[in-house]
Curated annotation (Swiss-Prot):
Protein's UniProt name: Peptide deformylase
Stretch forming the signal peptide: none
Native organism: Erwinia tasmaniensis (strain DSM 17950 / CFBP 7177 / CIP 109463 / NCPPB 4357 / Et1/99)
Regions that span the bilayer: none
Reported function: Removes the formyl group from the N-terminal Met of newly synthesized proteins. Requires at least a dipeptide for an efficient rate of reaction. N-terminal L-methionine is a prerequisite for activity but the enzyme has broad specificity at other positions.
Cofactor binding notes: Binds 1 Fe(2+) ion.
Length: 169
């Protein structure tokens, strides 16, 4: 397994719409394993393949405190959503920035697991929010797209400053 490079906003590759996975095979399983390693190394709770410049519909999630409840979503499909909620979300592709994003409180999805088996999942709370956030990545959408133009611009300016400081270090 290896840690992959996470793309950072405003990299345009984050806007590429991911393609469906044709077949779950050893290559896809290796990508899943590398994505988990990357997500844990970056201290995230979710990662979409788009964020590591792999434009296939693959998501890995682990919202557990002990980091031992891996969830793999290949070709996820939203079946139902209900209620309204929102928390301050962050994103590995938008470092050190957080914003309140409106989300559905509960979701029901269908996806394939790491072995290519189809399953359905009903989720609420943080898991439901994380699923929605990562599914947005698969269609080229970022959490900042839910914000006003002024807030997006402010985040862009903060990131440019952060990147300049990182380049000097």
């Amino acid at each position: 397994m290896s840690v992959l490079q996470v793309l950072h906003f405003p990299d345009e590759r984050l806007r590429i719409v991911a393609k469906p996975v044709k077949e779950v095979n050893a290559n896809i399983q290796r990508i899943v394993d590398d994505m988990f390693e990357t997500m844990y190394a970056e201290e995230g709770i979710g990662l979409a393949a788009t964020q590591v410049d792999i434009h296939q519909r693959i998501i890995v999630i682990d919202v557990s405190e002990d980091r031992d409840e891996r969830l793999v979503l290949i070709d996820p499909e939203l079946l139902e959503k209900s209620g309204e909620t929102g928390i301050e979300e962050g994103c590995l592709s938008i470092p050190e920035q957080r914003a309140l994003v409106p989300r559905a409180e509960k979701v029901k999805i269908r996806a394939l697991d790491r072995d290519g088996n189809s399953f359905e999942l009903e989720a609420d709370g943080l898991l439901a929010i994380c699923i929605q956030h990562e599914m947005d990545h698969l269609v080229g959408k970022l959490f900042i797209d839910y914000l006003s133009p002024m807030k997006r611009q402010r985040i862009r300016q903060k990131l440019e400053k952060l990147y300049r400081q990182s380049a000097r270090d």
